[in-house]
Curated annotation (Swiss-Prot):
GO MF annotation list: P-type potassium transmembrane transporter activity; potassium ion binding
Keywords on record: Cell inner membrane, Cell membrane, Ion transport, Membrane, Potassium, Potassium transport, Transmembrane, Transmembrane helix, Transport
The name this protein goes by in its record: Potassium-transporting ATPase potassium-binding subunit
Subcellular location: Cell inner membrane
Native source species: Francisella philomiragia subsp. philomiragia (strain ATCC 25017 / CCUG 19701 / FSC 153 / O#319-036)
Length: 572
């Protein structure tokens, strides 16, 4: 227990310590200020902008920015889709892995372009080295950069006033990659290599084990992909076992680095926001609410796994475990990590849009699995994905401002800008599109016979497997209850559609809100008239309950049919 507590304190301390310097660095990068990595990034940026030409020089309106983002994502999708279809004909394929089928290639291309990294294939047997390096790993960078760009646009729109432009997508994209994602990923990858993570393009090794059997040991460019997998909150593993595999996550050090890197940029953006709008207390308030939500989720998931089998005491097996005070659920968990390292990792992963796991989610207790679903279903606003976590949280922040202002009889405003009906329409659109997507697709899948055949469990847990898949897809997480055999045409197509709607539907609403906010006047008198202190403890509590009630209750009926009923079936 003391080890678990120390690990928790060190993790939180690390997160707090890196938030200000990294947040300041991100602020400087996107404000064209001098940084200590200019020597590395500027040569890449010059070549990149030279190729783009005039399109990278002029600032864009919110609509123009969105359409540039969308056109880039469409081109990226087509490229990845074609590579996956034709990978059997392409080089760097020593295992002679065949091209994917249409529905699986469609699903995978959508998955990586939307920063979801849902995988209906086994990484080491379904994708060649060429596809891993040129298609999937590249998307890990650019899809993460797209999310960061959207967050930066939203921050700019709050900071600027009486303007029409929100920045240039192509310029922002290069800054996100060359100044932030690429250099940090290189450092992390080097550390991983020294920790024992392979980085090569060798054919798989055939070895004769001490037990007398033959075994195939997969090889590949793992360290480079693993670094951006966590930093970019992508989550798609080189191996089917993801970060439970010793080649992806060999030591307690790599496990810790992965957890910190998942939250690093998302946490830093809270300080970036505060610094940009000239009110760092506002940024720390956002950080604090996120942290409280995270701690509560972690506590519930950890307790449910530590005591997840206590109900078996009533099943007359207490003599077997009589010397143990409680029965912990170690099924599906690496013994080298134990329960707390597993629940900490998976809480981080499902709170962000990462989706990587170091233990099997389908083997968690019903309540443990439910907490993972809730982390995703509330929009992954507990730090969240790179960029996506911030703009998702901002939607709840806007709603809390609106509710709080009306409760005290004041005109809603935030940081001196009037919040009007049109702003709230886009806010609610962003908040409701993913839950609607989850409920509609889950309801349809629940009555499709082919989906039933893809389940390894029936009843409440089987429904939980379906529900988890669409929550994960719609919120661009990518983790899964492995009991669902997802490589069917129906599941590949519908989960891909949920990923597209959940990603670009929300981004569209955020960009429209940004376009509205950037045009508004900033009035110090408006802040005084509103009299709603958005950095106060009371407002923090309001934001907290807005997230819990609006985000949590939206999905509660579905959770009642899944993990909650599953838990009740175990107890009674």
């Amino acid at each position: 227990m003391s080890y678990n507590f120390i690990l928790f304190v060190v993790f939180i301390f690390t997160l707090v310590i890196i938030t200000k310097p990294l947040g300041t660095y991100i602020f400087k990068v996107f404000n064209n200020e001098r940084t200590w990595l200019d020597w590395f990034a500027k040569p890449f940026q010059r070549v990149y902008l030279l190729i783009l030409g005039e399109s990278s020089k002029k600032e864009q309106s919110a609509k123009s920015y969105f359409f540039s983002l969308l056109s880039f994502s469409i081109m990226a999708f087509i490229f990845v889709f074609v590579v996956l279809l034709l990978q059997g004909l392409l080089p760097f394929n020593p295992q002679e892995i065949k091209g994917m089928g249409f529905s699986q290639a469609f699903n995978t291309a959508v998955s990586f372009v939307t920063n979801t990294n849902w995988q209906s294939y086994s990484g080491e047997t379904g994708v060649s080295h060429f596809s891993q390096m040129l298609a999937l790993a590249v998307q890990n960078f650019v899809s993460a950069a797209v999310g960061l760009c959207v967050a930066i646009v939203l921050i700019r729109s709050v900071a600027r006033h009486e303007a029409t432009k929100v920045g240039n997508f192509w310029n922002d994209l290069g800054k996100a990659i060359f100044w932030i994602l690429l250099p940090i990923s290189i450092i992390i990858a080097i550390v991983y290599i020294f920790q024992g993570v392979p980085q090569n393009i060798m054919a798989y090794l055939h070895v004769h084990t001490l037990a007398g059997s033959d075994q195939i040991i997969a090889q590949g460019p793992i360290a480079s992909q693993e670094a951006i997998k966590s930093l970019g909150t992508n989550g798609g593993g080189f191996f089917n076992a993801n970060s439970a595999h010793p080649y992806e996550n060999p030591t307690i050090i790599t496990n810790y680095i992965q957890m910190v890197s998942i939250f690093a940029i998302a946490a830093a953006l809270t300080y970036t926001f505060g610094k940009w709008v000239g009110n760092t207390k506002q940024g720390w308030m956002i950080f604090a609410v996120m942290l409280v939500l995270f701690v509560i989720s972690l506590m519930v998931m950890t307790i449910s796994e530590l005591h997840g089998l206590d109900f078996l005491h009533s099943k007359n097996i207490q003599d077997i475990y009589g010397q143990v005070g409680h029965l912990s659920n170690m099924e599906g968990k690496e013994t080298r990590f134990g329960i707390f390292n597993s629940t900490l990792y998976n809480t981080v992963s499902t709170s962000a849009s990462d989706g990587g796991v170091n233990s099997v989610m389908d083997s968690y207790s019903a309540i443990g699995g439910m907490m993972a679903m809730l982390n995703m279903a509330i929009g992954e606003v507990i730090f969240g994905g790179i960029g996506a976590g911030f703009y998702g949280f901002f939607m709840f922040l806007m709603l809390a401002v609106f509710i709080g202002s009306l409760m005290i009889g004041r005109a809603p405003s935030f940081l001196g800008k009037r919040i009007e009906a049109n702003d709230m329409k886009w806010t609610m659109f962003a908040l409701l599109i993913s839950p609607c997507c989850v409920l509609v697709f889950t309801g349809l899948a629940a009555v499709i016979p082919s989906v039933h055949q893809a389940l390894t469990n029936s009843g409440a847990h089987g429904f939980s497997e379906i529900l988890y898949a669409y929550i994960s897809g719609s919120n661009n997480n990518g983790s899964a209850f492995a009991g669902l055999a997802a490589n069917t045409s129906y599941l590949n197509i519908t989960i891909a559609l949920s990923m597209l709607i959940g990603r670009f539907g929300v981004i569209f609403a955020v960009m429209m809100l940004a376009g509205s906010l950037v045009k508004k006047k900033r009035s110090s008198q408006m802040s005084e008239i509103s009299s709603l202190d958005t950095t106060s403890f009371i407002f923090s509590v309001l934001v907290f309950f807005t997230i819990v009630l609006i985000g949590g209750l939206t999905i509660f009926p579905a959770l009642s049919l899944g993990p909650i009923l599953d838990q009740l079936n175990l107890n009674f």
